[in-house]
Amino acid sequence: MGKAVNIEHVEERVESELMPPPMYKVILNNDDYTPMDFVIEVLQLFFKKNEQDATDIMLAIHNQGKGICGVFPFGIAETKVAQVNQFARQNQHPLLCSLEKA
């Protein structure tokens, strides 16, 4: 008739299926040429930061060499990095966006 099911095995499988995806930090790196106003624009346009948050992150980038724009699942982080880097190149700025595991 029916097949016996190992409850512990099912619970373990369900638990592993519900694991959240690995998260990645999207980072903007400082350079000596990109204007601060452009960095603020990028933060507002691609990361939906308000003016104060964008300014705070821009100052962190300027003073510490890099700043975290947000933490996202890999696919979203990868897309944002590509969008920001393309936007920077289109506007002739060397601003570099990268990602690292959170």
Swiss-Prot record:
Q: Which InterPro entries match?
A: ClpS, ClpS_core, Ribosomal_bL12_C/ClpS-like
What biological process terms from GO does the record include? Answer: protein catabolic process; proteolysis
Alphabetized Pfam families for the sequence? ClpS (PF02617)
On assembly, the entry states: Binds to the N-terminal domain of the chaperone ClpA.
Q: Which family does it belong to?
A: Belongs to the ClpS family.
PANTHER family (alphabetical): ATP-DEPENDENT CLP PROTEASE ADAPTER PROTEIN CLPS (PTHR33473:SF19), ATP-DEPENDENT CLP PROTEASE ADAPTER PROTEIN CLPS1, CHLOROPLASTIC (PTHR33473)
Query: What function does the entry list?
Result: Involved in the modulation of the specificity of the ClpAP-mediated ATP-dependent protein degradation.
Q: What is this protein called?
A: ATP-dependent Clp protease adapter protein ClpS
Q: Which organism is it from?
A: Shewanella sediminis (strain HAW-EB3)
